[in-house]
């Protein structure tokens, strides 16, 4: 079904574009909100993403649904990163590599919080922390790839992840304590 939609979109079929939009808008909105929690900004980024998806479709070679989905997600992530960089909202803190090696990677067990609560806590992180944790945890990117995408050092990516986890850990503990 998806392959036929792609073929129809490549022939400029507006109904197929609408169907594809309806199929993926919810999932891609979730991806977008992980990076851009502001409602208006996220809607702009999502709209730009769909414009890019539809304009890039002419050269897209469909293989299978999972790779197509990955392509869609990659476009949304790149558009969100472009949005944040364009507005200079990504700020990064550098740590010396030796300091990074000494840091622990302990995380609390979030047994008592829901996925929605965790998503909310992540959305409250500063843009730089939130961006790196999303790229590393949800998109599965390495620090090297994150550094390339964001124009930062690998050590900076690692330190942002460390600080994001620390802050998230404190927020989770506060939430758990508040519930008890």
Task: Annotate each language-model stretch with its function.
Residues 59, 73-94, 163:
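Arg/Lys-rich amphipathic alpha helix in sigma70-family domain 2
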Residues 130, 165-180:
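Short, Lys/Arg-enriched C-terminal cap helix and immediately downstream tail that follows
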Residues 30, 44-51, 66-78:
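Structural recognition of an alpha-helix C-terminal capping motif at a helix-to-coil junction
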Residues 120-131, 139-156:
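Helix-turn-helix DNA-binding module
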Residues 10-11, 50-65, 87:
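Sigma70-family region 2
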Residues 2, 90-115:
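Internal acidic/polar
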Residues 21-39, 56, 122, 171-174:
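Amphipathic, Lys/Arg- and hydrophobic-enriched alpha-helical face
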Residues 1-27, 144-145, 150, 177-180:
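N-terminal module of bacterial RNA polymerase sigma factors
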